[in-house]
Amino acid sequence: MVKERCPKQAFQDSLEDIKERMKEKRIKKLAKVATVNKTLCTKVQILNSGSTAIKNYKANNTALALALEAEKLKTRQAQDLILGLKREHQRLIFEIFMLRRRLQSQQGRDTAESKLASLKDIIAKVTHNLLETASLLEPAHLLCSSANNNTPNPSKVEEKLSSGASAILRLPSHAPISDTLPKNVIPNRLEPEQRNFKDKVVLEANRNTAGVNRQSRGRRSHSNQPSFTSRLEECNNEDKTESGATMNKNVSLRRRASSLNICLEESLPLEDTNVNSEHTVVETERPFPTEEFSNESRTDREIDNVDNPASPLKVKCFPHANGSKMTGLASEAKQTSNKNKEEPRVGRERVKKGKAERVAVSQMKKPWENSKPRARSKSRDRSASKKSVAKEKMNSSLNSGDAFDFACEESIHVTPFRQNKQEESQNESSLEISSSEGELDDSLYKPYKDKSKNKNLKPDIAPVPLRSRSKRNTARKNSIAENELMSDVQAEANEKKITRNGLKRKSENSFTESAETYREKSFMPTCINTNNAIAENPEVKVFSDECNGGIIYTADEPSGASTPRISLSDVTNLPGNTDAKKHINLLFNEDEMKRSSTPSRKRRCKVSINYAEPKLSGKLRRGDPFTDSEFLQSPIFKNESKRNSLNRQSLSRYNEVFVGCRR
């Protein structure tokens, strides 16, 4: 086809088209810019809103802070006001309290003043009444003081009464009573100098009597009893004469205990102690002591004399006026002291002996021993109740360091081979007896171990074996002991020595003969084929070859009935399951039964030595948590069985929280 040519456009048209296109492009660009501006505006607006909110929050916070400060200031001011008011309140309360105190003190003063005024009035009235009574009693005193024979004229008495009444009326109120009394009436008091002197004498006398009483307990006084009583009588007679000259009959002349003590203890001059007639003391008569008091004082005196027979000065002084009573008491005290001199000495000796015994018992007594024995019925036989308790062996291996002490361990942990307690008690008693004999003996000292060995070397009694720690050591020790026993028996039985070749032949013959005799005698079915077993078993041949030195021929019995003696190590080397070993053991038992009438103790422990390398189970110890084989077989290390695993799988389907089957 022929291509049609497009019409050509003019230059202007093309320019217009280009302009239009450019305009469209601008519009599009503007539209795009407008959309971008819108998004930016929204973002800016969001940012502006957040900032404004923050500003608002800050403003609010500042306002709140200011308000809080203002309120705090107000509260502080209020608290200050409250404190000020409280102070004022306390001050007012204190003032009120002080005012109340003043009021109470004023009221008390008023009452005290009123009481004092009333008391003064009462005292004035009493003094007035006393003066009146004194004036009335003056003529009666004059009547009493006048002589008994001379009776006064009534006119003189009336004159004296009238003069005394006029003197009383003229006296002032403040005059003392002692001034108003006449000179003949003596008051019941001494002058101060004489009173002080008498008090001093009494105090010294009391001190001296106390010293004499203390000294009389420890040592004898050198003064004699008769001089003491005579001195008492002299004092009493002098007092009687002087008082009769100065005092009337109705005035008592009895002295107190203190004045008597002055006479007894102090060697004071009687002229100084006696008072003139003008200054004598008028005392009201006191009743004599009752019978009860006198009896009590006598018993006290007797007790004192018994306690201190060597002190004759210690006598109870009674306030009696008569000297005869004092002498009688002194003589009674002397008689009782002479009678009871020997009795307190015997009592003292007994008391001293009892005290010494108590001290010795208290020193010997131990703190863990009971002071009182337990009460038991007499009907019970105490000897039967007492049981022989085996004494505990002392641990002699103390301070031995870290080494393992077999003897100490054996004494603590008793093995099953030590269950025969009777033999132990017998051995202990024999050891105690031997030790006591050894102490008394003057022979040479032998150690304890030698004695025990010599006692245990009897052929009939087998030694009690200790608990073996290693099998080889025990086998070696047993073999040595057996060899020693055999050598002793051989020396006693036959002193001749036989060569090895002769021993081989005789041992083979005797061994076969003994087997035949044992087969005839025995009733056990297991020991019938012993001869065949011995003939066929090569170990027995080796045994018979090896233990030539151990076989001993006993010459006490005839050669046909002779039995071989084999050492313990050869027996233990045989295997445990062979019939030969059983046969040899039975032969040993039979031979021992023949020799000793008492049945010998069978061996409980058969030691077999195996020289093969021990297994793990043999090396492991029972009870040791580190090497115990049973501990490894505990449920922790066991493999779980199928049943347990199935049960656990079935149970695992269930949830712990929700009890239901999982699907």
From Swiss-Prot:
<keyword id="KW-0132">Cell division</keyword>
<feature type="region of interest" description="Disordered">
    <location>
        <begin position="278"/>
        <end position="401"/>
    </location>
</feature>
<keyword id="KW-0493">Microtubule</keyword>
<dbReference type="GO" id="GO:0045132">
    <property type="term" value="P:meiotic chromosome segregation"/>
</dbReference>
<feature type="compositionally biased region" description="Basic and acidic residues">
    <location>
        <begin position="280"/>
        <end position="304"/>
    </location>
</feature>
<feature type="coiled-coil region">
    <location>
        <begin position="110"/>
        <end position="132"/>
    </location>
</feature>
<comment type="similarity">
    <text>Belongs to the shugoshin family.</text>
</comment>
<keyword id="KW-0175">Coiled coil</keyword>
<protein>
    <recommendedName>
        <fullName>Shugoshin 1</fullName>
    </recommendedName>
</protein>
<feature type="compositionally biased region" description="Basic and acidic residues">
    <location>
        <begin position="366"/>
        <end position="394"/>
    </location>
</feature>
<keyword id="KW-0539">Nucleus</keyword>
<keyword id="KW-0498">Mitosis</keyword>
<dbReference type="Pfam" id="PF07557">
    <property type="entry name" value="Shugoshin_C"/>
</dbReference>
<dbReference type="GO" id="GO:0016607">
    <property type="term" value="C:nuclear speck"/>
</dbReference>
<feature type="region of interest" description="Disordered">
    <location>
        <begin position="417"/>
        <end position="478"/>
    </location>
</feature>
<dbReference type="GO" id="GO:0005874">
    <property type="term" value="C:microtubule"/>
</dbReference>
<keyword id="KW-0832">Ubl conjugation</keyword>
<keyword id="KW-0131">Cell cycle</keyword>
<dbReference type="InterPro" id="IPR011515">
    <property type="entry name" value="Shugoshin_C"/>
</dbReference>
<feature type="compositionally biased region" description="Basic and acidic residues">
    <location>
        <begin position="231"/>
        <end position="242"/>
    </location>
</feature>
<feature type="coiled-coil region">
    <location>
        <begin position="8"/>
        <end position="29"/>
    </location>
</feature>
<feature type="compositionally biased region" description="Basic and acidic residues">
    <location>
        <begin position="443"/>
        <end position="453"/>
    </location>
</feature>
<dbReference type="InterPro" id="IPR038889">
    <property type="entry name" value="Shugoshin1/2"/>
</dbReference>
<keyword id="KW-0995">Kinetochore</keyword>
<dbReference type="GO" id="GO:0000776">
    <property type="term" value="C:kinetochore"/>
</dbReference>
<feature type="region of interest" description="Disordered">
    <location>
        <begin position="207"/>
        <end position="250"/>
    </location>
</feature>
<feature type="compositionally biased region" description="Low complexity">
    <location>
        <begin position="427"/>
        <end position="437"/>
    </location>
</feature>
<comment type="function">
    <text>Plays a central role in chromosome cohesion during mitosis by preventing premature dissociation of cohesin complex from centromeres after prophase, when most of cohesin complex dissociates from chromosomes arms. May act by preventing phosphorylation of the stag2 subunit of cohesin complex at the centromere, ensuring cohesin persistence at centromere until cohesin cleavage by espl1/separase at anaphase. May regulate kinetochore microtubule stability in mitosis, possibly to sense tension on mitotic chromosomes.</text>
</comment>
<feature type="compositionally biased region" description="Basic and acidic residues">
    <location>
        <begin position="339"/>
        <end position="358"/>
    </location>
</feature>
<keyword id="KW-0159">Chromosome partition</keyword>
<keyword id="KW-0137">Centromere</keyword>
<comment type="subunit">
    <text>Binds microtubules.</text>
</comment>
<keyword id="KW-0158">Chromosome</keyword>
<dbReference type="GO" id="GO:0051301">
    <property type="term" value="P:cell division"/>
</dbReference>
